[in-house]
Amino acid sequence: MAFGALYMLSGLDAPWLGRQQRYRLKGYLRQMDAENLTRLTRRRAMMVEYWCRDSNLAKVETLIRPSAATGTLADSFQLAATDVVEGYVTASALDDIVRQCRLKQGVTPVRVRLHVTDNLPAGEGSMSLGVCAADLAESNDPRERRAGLETLQRLIDDHHRKEHQE
């Protein structure tokens, strides 16, 4: 349901949700603000951090669904691009990615942040704007957190406006 809420706020379809679930989510979203949404969607995936060689970063990016402010996504949040790659993978694909890209856990500096989930929405390319914003809203970096919360609140406000127009 967390991915469903974030996809709906992004204006995208969430075909894995039933009609009843979609109806309930619309009700929740009417009363939601960015802080509460961040808190309620934080369990959508488990985050694991890795060190990675520079030469393997591009490969990691091709094997995941990029998120947060990775690469060109940084512009969407008015953040400076960093050399950290962040994105989503299925739990079943994690070991293969770690092996192929020689990722090491517990080694600094952190270069890769993977959000691991069993229920990754189907699709190509980057995650939805709502998911990226939620990832940033959970960041320990104050600029990223603010950018994520502001974007989530804007998406919520836009969603409310569209609901009132219908």
Task: Map each language-model feature to its residues.
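Phosphate-handling catalytic interfaces
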Residues: 3, 7-15, 19, 23-166
